[in-house]
């Protein structure tokens, strides 16, 4: 909620002005955008539906918000009736970095260990001692091999991945290793 108050979602979702009511952002219909992106209903507004979120809903909403957060840089102060800042310039990368930092601090305390990746995907956090396996450099400069290893690793760690998804990720890694052999 604090990021919303600080204007981090103003560029995408708009903001409230005492003179003009709701000023639209880049996303005109947030509920529709969530439906098209996540393919689920009854997620927006968050304040209305959050109490009924499943774990997957919660993590999907985090990924959705990551795509739309941006740090407010410059704007004009609308002082009439305490309206506040009307942000006009934003930095998406800085906003995403701060969002990721704050979300990962929350996810650190969640019952199942997850982390928000630099790509905006919520992934299972590796168990203690296994971090090096997931962070190791791929022993190849071939972008196709690196891409396949990264995709398999992400598919294995992805929130909501089924046992079959994980099996397929292991098979994909085995195929790469066989090729490298």
PLM regions with names:
Residues 1-101:
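Charged interaction/catalytic cores of defense and host-pathogen modules
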Residues 63-148:
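Helix-loop junctions and short alpha-helical segments
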Residues 9-15, 32-40, 116, 121-122, ...:
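Generic preference for hydrophobic/aromatic residues in regular secondary structure cores
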Residues 38-46, 50-53, 125-129, 133, ...:
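Residue-level signal for well-ordered alpha-helical segments
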Residues 59, 100, 104-107, 170-177:
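Generic structural concept
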Residues 131-181:
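Amphipathic, oligomerization/interface secondary-structure segments
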Residues 6, 10, 69-72, 110-114, ...:
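Short secondary-structure junctions and interdomain/linker hinges
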């Amino acid at each position: 909620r604090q990021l919303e108050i600080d204007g981090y979602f103003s560029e995408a979702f708009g903001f409230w002005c005492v003179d003009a009511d709701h000023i639209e952002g880049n996303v005109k219909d947030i509920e529709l955008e969530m439906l098209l992106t996540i393919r689920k209903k009854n997620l927006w507004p968050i304040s209305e539906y959050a109490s009924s979120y499943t774990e997957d809903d919660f993590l999907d909403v985090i990924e959705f918000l990551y795509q739309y957060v941006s740090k407010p840089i410059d704007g004009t102060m609308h002082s009439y009736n305490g309206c506040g800042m009307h942000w006009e310039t934003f930095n998406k990368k800085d906003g995403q970095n701060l969002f990721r930092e704050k979300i990962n601090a929350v996810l650190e305390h969640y019952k199942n260990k997850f982390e928000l990746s630099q790509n905006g995907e919520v992934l299972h956090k590796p168990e203690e001692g296994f971090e090096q396996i997931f962070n190791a450099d791929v022993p190849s400069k071939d972008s196709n091999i690196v891409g396949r290893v990264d995709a398999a690793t992400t598919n294995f760690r992805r929130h909501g991945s089924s046992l079959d998804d994980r099996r397929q990720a292991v098979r994909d890694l085995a195929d790469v290793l066989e090729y490298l052999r």
